[in-house]
């Protein structure tokens, strides 16, 4: 009764009867960008995944060091489902990422926080929860630039984290 029904409905995609999992948070994957650095580079704020292939951003792009999230960016850029099983679409996405690699400063996970707060990159692919932390930290540090978040118009990954108790857990009562 204390869990938003929308969470329970979302979790039915993998737990149809809501018997084995308890959802606790959800989020998106998007692009965090430094408004000051983009202004200095003469690059408009990103609105599409394709903006991460803009050569003016060479050395200023942080990509997720995650096969799923990196491929999601390339697949969505090309108008495909992030869950594509098509060999041709996956091959095209792979080539897109290979072509993008010279523009990428780093493939990171947690380091995107420090790099974006430190003004070390203009754009970064990031989870929405991390974005909230980064924006709060930027305000508390009194930074002279804004960090903004956008979900590209082609769409994104909407994710849901859930707790489960493994069948072979030793202390199920304590969970």
Model-assigned labels for residue ranges:
Residues 1-28, 41-53:
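Hinge/lid segment of periplasmic solute-binding proteins
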Residues 2-7, 69-70, 113, 155-158:
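A short acidic, often aromatic-flanked loop/helix-cap motif at beta-alpha or helix-coil junctions
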Residues 17-26, 33-35, 41, 54-68, ...:
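Short beta-strand->loop
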Residues 23, 41-44, 62-66, 85, ...:
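Extracytoplasmic/periplasmic, Sec-exported soluble proteins
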Residues 28-29, 37-39, 59, 67-71, ...:
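Solvent-exposed loop/turn segments at secondary-structure junctions
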Residues 32-37, 75-79, 159-171:
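A bilobed periplasmic-binding-protein/Venus flytrap-type ligand-binding module shared by bacterial periplasmic
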Residues 62-66, 70-74, 78, 82-150:
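Ligand-binding pocket segment of bilobal, Venus flytrap-like solute-binding proteins
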Residues 138-175:
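Extracytoplasmic/periplasmic substrate-recognition and gating elements
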């Amino acid at each position: 009764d204390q869990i938003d029904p929308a969470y329970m409905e979302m979790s039915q995609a993998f737990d149809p009867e809501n018997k084995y999992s308890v959802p606790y948070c959800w989020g998106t994957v998007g692009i965090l960008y430094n408004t000051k650095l983009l202004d200095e580079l003469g690059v408009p704020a990103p609105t599409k995944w394709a903006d991460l292939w803009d050569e003016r951003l060479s050395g200023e792009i942080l990509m997720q060091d995650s096969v799923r999230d990196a491929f999601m960016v390339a697949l969505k850029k090309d108008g495909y489902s992030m869950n594509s099983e098509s060999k041709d679409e996956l091959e095209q996405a792979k080539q897109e990422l290979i072509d993008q690699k010279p523009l990428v400063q780093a493939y990171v996970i947690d380091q995107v926080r420090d790099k974006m707060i430190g003004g070390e990159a203009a754009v970064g692919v990031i989870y929405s929860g991390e974005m909230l932390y980064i924006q709060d930290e930027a305000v508390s540090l009194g930074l002279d630039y804004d960090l903004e978040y956008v979900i590209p118009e082609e769409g994104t990954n909407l994710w849901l984290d859930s707790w489960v108790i493994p069948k072979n857990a030793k202390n199920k009562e304590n969970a």
